[in-house]
Amino acid sequence: MAYWLCITNEDNWRVIKEKNIWGVPERHKNTIAKVKKGDKLLIYIKQENVNGEVKPSRIVAVYETASEVYRDSSRIFKSPKGMGNETFPLRIKLKPVKIFDRPIEFKPLIPKLKFITNKRKWSGHLMGKAMREIPEEDYRLILEYAT
């Protein structure tokens, strides 16, 4: 089993929660191809301005993958600014494990997370990625903050 941090925004988090589907752009096909049924996915919402309020980067849920990767270009996800008509066609069906009552703010976790080796420029570990594998130790640490 592998553990993944899946990077999204507020709009597409609503889609994930409603439809139990994770999707990535074609350019991330090599990454999503490594995901197997039964893997655990943490949903990370990047910092953004929502209705004039700056919401910090946070982890909102954990899911288990319930399918292999499949292709579907139907428009269910919202294309973020600068991504044109992106449909996130490489998808995986999900099964919710836990949707956190209170999101876990990400910045306080940074000093403790093993996968973030550059603590000062930590966003570089996530920038330009749709998802990234994380060590089981980091996954367990994040879950501790959810309780």
Swiss-Prot record:
Transmembrane segments: none annotated. Pfam families: EVE. It comes from the Archaea. Gene3D superfamilies: ph1033 like domains. Signal peptide: none annotated. CDD domains: EVE-like. This is UPF0310 protein AF_2356. The lineage of its organism: Archaea, Methanobacteriati, Methanobacteriota, Archaeoglobi, Archaeoglobales.
